UniProtKB/Swiss-Prot annotation:
Record key words, sorted: Disulfide bond, Glycoprotein, Glycosidase, Hydrolase, Signal
Family the entry assigns: Belongs to the glycosyl hydrolase 1 family.
Name of the featured protein: Beta-glucosidase 16
Glycosylation sites per record: N80, N357
GO terms for MF: beta-glucosidase activity
Enzyme Commission numbers on file: 3.2.1.21
Disulphide bridges: C218-C226
Expression induction: By abscisic acid (ABA) and dark.
Organism, scientific name: Arabidopsis thaliana (Mouse-ear cress)
Residues in the signal sequence: 1-21
Pfam families in the cross-refs: Glyco_hydro_1
Catalytic reaction list: Hydrolysis of terminal, non-reducing beta-D-glucosyl residues with release of beta-D-glucose
Amino acid sequence: MRGKFLSLLLLITLACIGVSAKKHSTRPRLRRNDFPQDFVFGSATSAYQCEGAAHEDGRGPSIWDSFSEKFPEKIMDGSNGSIADDSYNLYKEDVNLLHQIGFDAYRFSISWSRILPRGTLKGGINQAGIEYYNNLINQLISKGVKPFVTLFHWDLPDALENAYGGLLGDEFVNDFRDYAELCFQKFGDRVKQWTTLNEPYTMVHEGYITGQKAPGRCSNFYKPDCLGGDAATEPYIVGHNLLLAHGVAVKVYREKYQATQKGEIGIALNTAWHYPYSDSYADRLAATRATAFTFDYFMEPIVYGRYPIEMVSHVKDGRLPTFTPEESEMLKGSYDFIGVNYYSSLYAKDVPCATENITMTTDSCVSLVGERNGVPIGPAAGSDWLLIYPKGIRDLLLHAKFRYNDPVLYITENGVDEANIGKIFLNDDLRIDYYAHHLKMVSDAISIGVNVKGYFAWSLMDNFEWSEGYTVRFGLVFVDFEDGRKRYLKKSAKWFRRLLKGAHGGTNEQVAVI
């Protein structure tokens, strides 16, 4: 009897080992030397999401302060970024975390209103803000971490919104140029990678079409409680001004600073990757149009000096602005690298073009969905918009290479969220799976010949996630918002540490290999 029991126990044990091994084998096993020797690994945050100290040391309000504090109902949990991760006061601890994990670089943004509280040079420079960023940059360099700086990550000074409508005003372009030049002057001796704008498409889409993000504008027929707006015209004006602002910032950097500071400058663009809903010709064209209205919307002007033909042919009634010959020339080649922010993929379905209630979204004549025949494109994350589909990052990189003359690329954001369950949770195997599968796809793209130079995980730590507030967590580091903003390394941070030291990554959770 005892022998039968031991035999049964052995069979159960072997079966469990087999299941565990099967799960383990689904995660790619990566080493740092699977990537080029000079490949940069880093992590990323943004100013409003993590700095806090929103009303301290002379910082002026941004549109995100106004949006979240005056209209808390527009944030899922009624929160704001006034304290956030308190990185303004805890930056040394954050730099130590980057060093401890083993990252080469840190991508962060500068709060425009922290150094120019009224948004303009005429309104005065806040020396305390300059000092903060000098201290952060110097601390990073002292730990061997490269600063990779974004100039504008959505937090426009509120003074400019009030003065001329912010991104809707032509004045924005020159004000951004002046702000960018101030940053080049103050920090460019140490900062060698600059990003002008982060995700201009998100600013256009969620700030002026859906109204989900500051300044919260949309058409009344879309959402009656929007703070004004016209989603048929304003998005195109905003996108145009953002492109021109990018162009003038790159121009001043190249003409006055690049030769001596020896840095490089680019832009960070985002999109889901779009797959045809069916094999029909109409749906294949719809997938192309969907990308034209998101990623190509900004790539086409900065590579070729024009808007994508799909936009030109679909946006009626003169609503799509045009570039002057001088503007077109300025925009052509206005990058040393392109940042790619990728999280998820979608199916694109051709639909009839709208004849009423027109928005920039309806102009594309595409319906974007996350499932086909009842089957999601990939497993769901903490946010309903994030369906996990690693192959999309490779296909997006290939698109950038072959349509846009093989540019230098960085993955400037890639990550996954989980719901905030209200207690310390460090065993984030889902996040490890996400990173492993996406990094494998990046490695595959490099082996095909895509010129990817680096990868930044979003995010270094849990932070204020815009309209979702603190209801979801993207971080490699857990932040306890109830206990002094204490930081704890999650399992994913330790996985990265092993990867960056050359060990295989991997535990026993799985995500479908796609």
